[in-house]
């Protein structure tokens, strides 16, 4: 994929996260693609990826994910271990079951490997989990 094609792909991917339909997110992944969050156990396959996306959508019914920027190399430089770095921001109110109604705004990135069908073969997502937990309890302030 060219950088222009990847940028369009990234914009559509962010829109899928805003759709409240987890299958829309999973459709960006290869059939056996994987998604991990903060070095956790990867969700493998579209059904498992949809489950992860659905969890965020369930917890944040008003969730908005914005596409911030795209890079072609890893954040730490050197030989690229990925095809692209997708930077994003999530804003939403934790009003799902068990939620405390607090507004959350976090940013992070995903390291993408893209397959020959131009789908995500692997994504390793990262965000500041301590700040996320703090906002879940206390909100943005």
Where are these regions (language model features)?
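C-terminal and inter-domain tail/linker signature
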Residues: 1-141
């Amino acid at each position: 994929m060219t950088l222009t094609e990847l940028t369009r792909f990234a914009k559509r991917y962010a829109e899928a996260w805003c759709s409240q339909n987890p299958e829309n997110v999973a459709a960006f992944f290869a059939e056996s693609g994987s998604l991990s969050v903060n070095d956790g156990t990867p969700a493998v396959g579209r059904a498992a990826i949809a489950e992860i996306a659905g969890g965020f959508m369930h917890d944040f019914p008003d969730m908005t994910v914005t596409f911030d920027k795209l890079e072609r190399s890893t954040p730490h430089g050197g030989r690229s271990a990925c095809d692209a770095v997708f930077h994003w921001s999530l804003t939403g109110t934790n009003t799902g079951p068990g939620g405390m109604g607090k507004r959350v705004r976090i940013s992070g990135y995903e390291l993408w490997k893209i397959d020959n069908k131009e789908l995500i073969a692997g994504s390793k997502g990262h965000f500041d989990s301590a700040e996320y937990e703090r906002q879940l309890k206390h909100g943005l302030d």
